Amino acid sequence: MRNSDCKTRWRFGVLAALAVTLVAFAPQLYFSLSKGSHWNGAYAQTHGDESVYASYLNALIDGRPRRNNPYSGRDDSPEHPAAESYLSVQFLPPVLIATTARLVTVSSTKAFMALTVITAFASALAVFWLLASILKDSRLAAIGVLAVLLASSANLIAEYLFGLGAANNYLPFLRRYLPAASFPIMLIYCGLLLQMLTATSKRVASASVVSAGVLFAVLVFSYFYHWTFAVVWTVCLAGIWLAVRQHERKRVALLLLILAGFMIAAGAPYFVLISRLGATTGEAHFMAASHKPDLFRLTELFGVLIVALIGFMVSRGRVKASEPTVIFTLACAVTPFLLFNQQILTGKSLQPFHYEVFIGSYTTALAAFVAVILLWRGFTVTSPAVARILLTLVAGGAVLSGSAEATLMTRRQLPANQIRDDARPALLRLAQIARQTKDGSLDTKSVVYAPDFIVASSISTTAPQPVLWAPYLFVFPDVTLMEDKERLASFLYYKDVNFNNIDQFRLESLDNEQSYYLSSLIGRGRFNPRLSVNWQPIAADEVHLALDYYRNFVATFDRTQAARPLVSYLLLSADDPVKLSNFDRWYERDEGEHVGNYILFRVRLRS
């Protein structure tokens, strides 16, 4: 364990990256092979939010402007300028992916499949490079890759096994296109910053700080939770470094000033874009006012253990507090405390679980791995043979953990993915129709009504036509929360949904879909306690008000409401007919076009 190789042996990193990539792509591989010749080319959605990212990406591939709403069909134009959305502000990944997709003529579906492979492989190599530069041991770094990327979210398996809930974010770093696209960049930024601080050559230090500054700018326009994490982590790293390596203060301060210049240069235009966000953005994304401390998240608890372990080793003289590896580890361990408690000073909290799920768990796992290796090196408690066995067990356990997450991910999403794939031929037909307009323009006005919740979410991932309602319609600033609520009520009314005989004191008796609909009528995000630090359980009087709203909506529904928005297409499964007496009261259909397992009707409002 004491012997280290100063030269990075990339073959170990490549092997680890191949293992991670295989686990990452397994859900797609299984899905495609399980459908065999009946696979219609749909990507295997693995995380709940991927449909909104795929929809926005598909709109960009179609050549629509950066400020667009793929669900409503409303795009930015000189006549109707659109506000910024959280997707249009984080534009670098989708614009780059869309540009590449157009150049090589691939769809958003194929782009998502490719992104999984690219992200998994690149992230693994980034972790390997970072650990190899810290530990000076390529074999250990390769094992660390598996531990960090495949076991960081192992707690989700425990939650599943003990019946504490089924997570929606297994192997979360792979969620496309965010945080997947910026995840390896975040890791490389960390490595460059460490390289900047430890470089003995001015040329290397200068190159590192410039590279880190450029990557920070990329993060700023890629993913909010990554660039804000980078800022806090940089402050922690710089603060600890300056405190324990005082003899380097002048040199380090100069480098940090250069980095700060890059940060300010990137932040200035970013905050201009932020100032142009829609008025409902904060509410739509569950911005909460709170000064309440948040001290008991898993990453924070592990952070305490890591700091205690480092403190123990320093007190025993096994490591020095001034060692770069120790400083790096401490910075990773301390950062979550600042991130999860910044609201004590700012009074604002924005879905902080994203820090834990999409970056904090990985940097904490990385710090834990480094701390354990430092402990092992400082206290030679086992023979080299036993050490090799233990490390093999760590690697095997990590692969097993990642495989278990991939399996749970596949199992959870399989029914919905099958529906998406069955509907794909009809969605491709819609996309074809949208390009057959008289003036040659793309049809982004003809609204599609798909009563199936999953199909409604999937239409915009392939076709440019807007939809009556979809779960993520409300996150775009052109749609107010009231409009979203009305469109949801129309969506439910058309397919004859009623909430009769619902016990407002026993909502747990509802199935997941009904529960989602009802909670959304009460208020967006009320179904998920993780979305806001101020979340409160739904009260009986709120249920009563929502039911009254829906009953009144149904009772007063008229032709004016039926035309808001005007529906042009109806998409139904041929194998699972839905009662649509309310829809047929207001719209008349043509004979329908059979496309695969679906029927596409052209409809018009009755006179």
Residue ranges and their predicted role:
Residues 228-233, 349-380:
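Hydrophobic/aromatic-rich transmembrane helices and adjacent perimembrane loops
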Residues 1-34, 390, 607:
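Start-transfer (signal-anchor) and selected internal transmembrane alpha helices
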Residues 257-264, 375-406:
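Signature aromatic-anchored transmembrane alpha helix within multi-pass, membrane-resident enzymes
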Residues 49, 215-341, 345-352:
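Transmembrane catalytic cores of multi-pass membrane glycosyltransferases
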Residues 466-570:
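Luminal/periplasmic acceptor-recognition loop/helix of membrane-associated glycosyltransferases
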Residues 190-192, 207-224:
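Membrane-interface alpha helices of multi-pass inner-membrane proteins
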Residues 22-185, 224-228, 407-417:
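Active-site lumenal/periplasmic loops and adjacent helix-entry segments of GT-C-fold
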Residues 57, 388-482:
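Extracytoplasmic
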